[in-house]
């Protein structure tokens, strides 16, 4: 348990940031789930649309510090390859 006033404030801030980051991470996962559903269904148009929506959301998570840059790039690259494969 935090004892000093600054430690108590830090604990409050961490709690708020954790809630925000959890929401951001959840939002990214939702977009990825929609894309995954479109890919497994084999729906080309839905997959392309879902990818166009998911890619900026993933990169936004990077700028907000939720995902690491390389992790996001790897995810986007692999998803783009899968979308390209279904489109061909």
From Swiss-Prot:
The answer to whether keyword Thylakoid applies is no
User: Which GO BP terms apply?
Assistant: translation
Where is the organism placed in the taxonomic lineage, from the top?
A: Bacteria, Pseudomonadati, Pseudomonadota, Alphaproteobacteria, Hyphomicrobiales
Q: Which UniProt keywords apply?
A: Ribonucleoprotein, Ribosomal protein, RNA-binding, rRNA-binding
What family does this belong to?
Belongs to the bacterial ribosomal protein bS20 family.
Q: Which gene name belongs to this protein? A: rpsT
SUPFAM superfamilies annotated for this entry? Ribosomal protein S20
Please tell me whether the keyword rRNA-binding is annotated for this protein. Answer: yes
Q: Which InterPro entries match?
A: Ribosomal_bS20, Ribosomal_bS20_sf
Q: Name one GO molecular function term.
A: structural constituent of ribosome
Q: Where is the segment annotated Disordered?
A: 1-25
**Organism encoding this protein:** Azorhizobium caulinodans (strain ATCC 43989 / DSM 5975 / JCM 20966 / LMG 6465 / NBRC 14845 / NCIMB 13405 / ORS 571)
Q: What is this protein called?
A: Small ribosomal subunit protein bS20
- Show the GO cellular component annotation of the record: cytosol; small ribosomal subunit
**Function recorded in the entry:** Binds directly to 16S ribosomal RNA.
């Amino acid at each position: 348990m935090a004892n000093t006033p600054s430690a108590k404030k830090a604990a409050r801030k961490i709690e708020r940031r954790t809630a925000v980051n959890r929401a951001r991470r959840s939002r990214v996962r939702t977009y990825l789930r929609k894309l995954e559903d479109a890919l497994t269904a084999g729906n080309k148009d839905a997959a392309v649309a879902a990818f166009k929506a998911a890619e900026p959301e993933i990169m936004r998570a990077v700028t907000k510090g939720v995902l690491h840059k390389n992790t996001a790039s790897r995810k986007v690259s692999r998803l783009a390859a899968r979308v390209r494969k279904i489109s061909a």
